[in-house]
Amino acid sequence: MLTVNAKDFGLIPNVEELQHGAIQKAIDHCFAQGGGDVVIPKGVYHLGDIRLRSHITLRLESGVHLMGSRNPEDYFNHRGDKVEPIAPERITDAPYVGLWTIHGETEYEENKPEYRFRRLPASRWNNAIIRAIDAEDIKVIGERDSVIDGVNCFDPQGEEDYRGPHGMTFYNCKNVELKGYTIQQTGNWAHWLLFCENITMTDVQTLAGHDGADFFSCRNVAVENCVFHTGDDCIAGFGNINVHISGCLLNSSCSAMRFSATNALIEHCRMVGPGQYCFRGSMSKEEKAAGAPSALIGHRNNMLSAFTYYADFSMPIPALPGNILIADCEFENADRFLHYNFSGNETWQRYRPLDSIEFRNIKATNVAMPINAYGAEEVPLSLVLRNIDMSVKEEMADKNLIHACHYRSIVVDGLKVRGKVKNLICKWSDGYISLRGLEGVPDTVVTDNKPFFAQGI
């Protein structure tokens, strides 16, 4: 396999001038030879966007610090790509559209104009420091102390009038390996993969910024031994099939996981709040514009939920979400244990409902709000809580532990609760309920005739 050093293509360390051109030359040289490794030697490098291509490995030596430009206009180099030109129909200037402004959706629409900003690969919103389109066998491998830094790039034309480019955007790629580096302070999501297949992410550390890793309509995803300290959701996405997440630390100021999939195993993970870095949406416009660090003082950093269901109309969901097992995990200081709310008032939970989810061997501390298990009438939920050790905050004393509606079955097999709750289950519909091995919690199941409401997150 061909190996080249990017310095031989003009890469200069520790200067203010943008260096993405030299890195791209090295990538394109290897691509023309059928693939290879592009080595980035120790040093600080400022850059706009670079495009990985099939059979290319980007290797970051120890001490590499790739710093994204603070100018969001520096991330459009892909539009002038002459090696693999992007077809005009895949390029759009469509602006970001807040999903909460789109009403009346009942089914997925492939060509809905409001979602062009997300679904087409060459949009402003999809910009990133590192991107790949229609590529296979691509890798980003970092040695210890290699860093990719988004410098909190501010874009007044971006999402919510401030979010800048992602750290990485991979669109319709196969056989993706991400390993070893630290990625921090990205203008938007650190990793954004859509329509990808066979993904492994190992020993990656994500700090500050927004979401840590977003997988949408992907197949065969493995995330192992990664560390997330994020201002937004640690791991997010939906429409995925076959997912394994193991041995990760997820520290968030939003949800540890805002996620859904068909066939998913999440095991041996710690989901810990409050966030080490604040949710940047709580910062002032002046702080955002200056690219200020994600400080905690005066900004929100509580973890809203350990697991929040996710399924909106922006991307396809090819299979019914379900068969999700979360096992041998710890939830610490998450306000909510589970937040599944298909009642209709949740912007990001409206497309395909969840069929089944099980929590097994979970220790949860300082839960502050009820478990929401509100399914769909046409696809009632199967919920299993098995061998759960949970402590709840004082404010739960007048609240029910579980809120349930449109459920096929609720099986509780081993539940120890430290602290007081009003009732075990409050239900808005009927279904099969099995209760065994309760300790420290009443076995009462009550019915509520008032309309169900849960605050969206």
What are these regions (language model features)?
Residues 1-457:
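Extracellular/periplasmic carbohydrate-active domains that bind, remodel
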